[in-house]
A protein has these predicted regions:
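Membrane-cytosol interface segments of multi-pass membrane proteins
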Residues: 1-173
Length: 173
């Protein structure tokens, strides 16, 4: 696994160039740069999920397992930060019009999540794995899980609600 990490590192720095003397990158949080950084973390998230299903006991796997242990679920922190920053910039530029759209973002995300839950239910049905009705219904709200990991979706949905309520109060007053 450490070889995959080295390849990822090489790809990540391949196009990088240091700023010259007296130069400052004012676009460090623009969409192009943040997408590149998020790409690195997408791969780390995929590696992290892959480790749950494969055996990694070789000597070349230990550096990655140590890194994974230290990073934990923080590999998604960049997504939360950049999303929040992007939403704040959109609110700064578009104001109340954008704030009103946050609820539709909430419902779109929940709908997509529920489609994934349906897929899990179908696979579990095929595998003859059954869950109580209450647990299934709560899984559609992200309150419980039926084999899927939902903590990130729950966090994003809650942050959407907090942001919507906060800005509705701030912009109306």
């Amino acid at each position: 696994m450490v070889f995959f990490l080295l390849i990822l590192l090489a790809v990540a720095v391949a196009g990088a160039r240091p700023c010259g003397p007296g130069e400052f990158n004012t676009d460090y949080l623009d969409k192009k740069n943040t997408t590149a950084v998020n790409g690195i973390f997408v791969v780390l998230v995929l590696f992290s999920h892959y480790v749950q299903y494969a055996d990694f006991e070789g000597p070349f796997d230990m550096p990655y397992l140590t890194l994974r242990q230290h990073l934990g679920q923080m590999v998604v922190a960049t997504f939360l930060f950049y999303s929040g920053y992007g939403m704040m910039e959109a609110i700064r530029r578009k104001g109340d019009g954008y704030v009103r759209k946050i609820l539709s973002k909430f419902w779109q995300l929940l709908f997509r999540f529920d489609l994934a839950v349906l897929l899990y239910l179908a696979v579990n049905q095929i595998l003859d794995i059954h869950f109580p009705l209450r647990e299934v219904l709560l899984a559609f709200t992200t309150w419980t899980v039926i084999g899927n990991s939902n903590w990130y979706i729950t966090a994003v949905l809650i942050l959407y609600v907090i942001m919507y309520i906060s800005f509705r109060i701030c912009l109306s007053g």
